């Protein structure tokens, strides 16, 4: 089990909240500000992805901006003896729409199977296509089954669920 998986499964730290930031919805700088706000509000994992309207460059720029902001806040907190310096420990994990939206800067990737998709691309195709990149970049894969219960939304339409 990798660092991100261990972090997710560690019961000693209690309940955690994760926020999903879609790179297509804002600039990387705005995404970084939203991630910082979420971290200050108690989120303990940042998921990046989920959109059909983004590409590898946008995802990468967003993850880099978020990680730089979290590291800067963590460093600043380390200079203040009264502050808690844990923002740099928040993992930034890919929640990709597919193999065309990956980044080597991520701490991990939700390697997911859309379990009720009628399209083999979302059952195994995207995973097979993205696996060489994930391995080469050293990104920790986090296995995940994804089930869409009401296929009226965009994810259900795109994933043919």
Cite the ranges covered by each PLM segment.
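N-terminal amphipathic alpha-helix/helix-capping segment at the start of soluble metabolic enzymes
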Residues: 1-21, 126-143
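Glycine-rich, proline-tolerant flexible connector loops at the mouths of alpha/beta enzymes
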Residues: 45-62
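Conserved anion-binding
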Residues: 95-161
């Amino acid at each position: 089990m990798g660092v991100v998986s261990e972090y997710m499964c560690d019961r000693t730290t209690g309940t955690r909240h994760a926020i999903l930031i879609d790179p297509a919805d804002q600039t990387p700088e705005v995404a970084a500000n939203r991630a910082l706000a979420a971290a200050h509000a108690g989120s303990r994992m940042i998921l990046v992805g989920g959109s059909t309207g983004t590409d590898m460059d946008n995802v990468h720029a967003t993850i880099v901006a978020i990680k730089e902001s979290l590291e800067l806040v963590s460093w600043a907190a380390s200079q203040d003896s009264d502050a808690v310096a844990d923002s740099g420990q928040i993992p930034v994990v890919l929640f990709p729409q597919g193999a065309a939206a990956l980044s080597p800067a991520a701490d991990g990737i939700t390697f997911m199977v859309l379990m009720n998709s009628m399209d083999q691309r979302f059952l195994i195709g995207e995973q097979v296509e993205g696996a060489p990149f994930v391995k080469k970049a050293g990104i920790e894969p986090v296995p995940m089954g994804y089930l869409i219960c009401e296929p009226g939304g965009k994810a259900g339409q795109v994933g043919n669920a």
